[in-house]
């Protein structure tokens, strides 16, 4: 029962969709286990870009099953739009399966997300205003509406009416905002549920049956370890658990059935929104990396903050997600730089060096990155297909990253295309 988990090891946008798409060729089932349509991944097939937010990357393989697990919060409207977008581009969603236990994002979640963020003033977290956080809040408070509830007209009506009464009081009294109308939401979202009904099932059964039958299952994470609500840069995090441990909760598959964990990272670092970022660059080098790497959010369109590769962050990701392999992306973006840097440790203001990532943001603010500087390379490496074809400086950079993180590099990428992802070691054993 081979199974592989793909996790982002930084602050998201590491190229998980690309690696998941690449690994999907040897998988038979591909599953999302957390997050919602706040995450975006771009996949390039035959030079054409596809941007997905909810549907797993495996949807491009019609013979494979694509699963949206119970740990995902689903915006039915967004999901239907994504299915239509794929259909317009000749991609069928017939192989899609949606967990009946997944929770639903409703208009009051998005409205509350916006109002809460606005109320924070200059202390905003940088949410995508997709309603993700409020949906997970309702789930934890045991008042959420699940896909199974959405499909049952009587249950959906009862729970929506109850929830909307509470939310509307909050909108009016706490935020001085207009209430939402019940009938409009009820009719619209019940119809969405009926459109999605043919995809809905108990996905835990599908996943476990597949694994028990010896089929290869790929679990696709959203965001990254540093955005994990427990292990990330709290409170500048998402509302779910992107770490590998989130798979068991968000898919209904036990931990004994997980074989390998592939951490995906870029050869540099990026993040969207507010929060600590020790190696962030504000100079011309940072601007060059952003423009060459097209570092703008798939979901928000916001320019991403960029910085040097941080091995302190990566070792944290290795530890809390149990990484067995590493996929190193976007090495080509660093081409043309005279020198490249890797953060190897942090230094406190008192001169003490630390090699772990602090939980306290105050402690983190007192730290400065300690860099190891390596020679850069000027060559265009986008057509390189083996490690040996890379210029010596690029080859040394890749090796040094593996040494500092302490994880075997199984693939390296020199561009966005499938053909630009190069295998050093198969995680499937094939």
Swiss-Prot record:
Record's protein name: Adenylosuccinate synthetase
NCBIfam families registered for this protein in UniProt: PRK01117.1, purA
Location in or out of the cell: Cytoplasm
PANTHER family referenced in this protein's UniProt entry, alphabetically: ADENYLOSUCCINATE SYNTHETASE
Family affiliation: Belongs to the adenylosuccinate synthetase family.
UniProt keyword annotations, A-Z: Cytoplasm, GTP-binding, Ligase, Magnesium, Metal-binding, Nucleotide-binding, Purine biosynthesis
Assembly with partners or alone: Homodimer.
Lineage, opening ranks: Bacteria, Bacillati, Bacillota, Bacilli, Lactobacillales
An example Gene Ontology biological process: 'de novo' AMP biosynthetic process
Annotated function: Plays an important role in the de novo pathway of purine nucleotide biosynthesis. Catalyzes the first committed step in the biosynthesis of AMP from IMP.
InterPro entries: Adenylosuccin_syn_GTP-bd, Adenylosuccin_syn_Lys_AS, Adenylosuccinate_synth_dom1, Adenylosuccinate_synth_dom2, Adenylosuccinate_synth_dom3, Adenylosuccinate_synthetase, P-loop_NTPase
Binding sites annotated in the UniProt record for substrate: 298-304
Main location: cytoplasm
Pathway: Purine metabolism; AMP biosynthesis via de novo pathway; AMP from IMP: step 1/2
Binding residue positions for Mg(2+): 13, 40
Requisite cofactors: Mg(2+)
Active site, UniProt feature: 13 (proton acceptor), 41 (proton donor)
Coiled-coil annotated spans: none
Cellular component, GO annotation: cytoplasm
Textual note on the cofactor: Binds 1 Mg(2+) ion per subunit.
Gene3D superfamilies: Adenylosuccinate Synthetase, subunit A, domain 1 (3.40.440.10), Adenylosuccinate Synthetase, subunit A, domain 2 (1.10.300.10), Adenylosuccinate Synthetase, subunit A, domain 3 (3.90.170.10)
EC number(s) stated in the UniProt entry for this protein: 6.3.4.4
Top EC class for this record: ligase
One GO MF term attached to the UniProt entry: GTP binding
Substrates-to-products reaction catalysed: IMP + L-aspartate + GTP = N(6)-(1,2-dicarboxyethyl)-AMP + GDP + phosphate + 2 H(+)
Binding site for GTP: 12-18, 40-42, 304, 330-332, 413-415
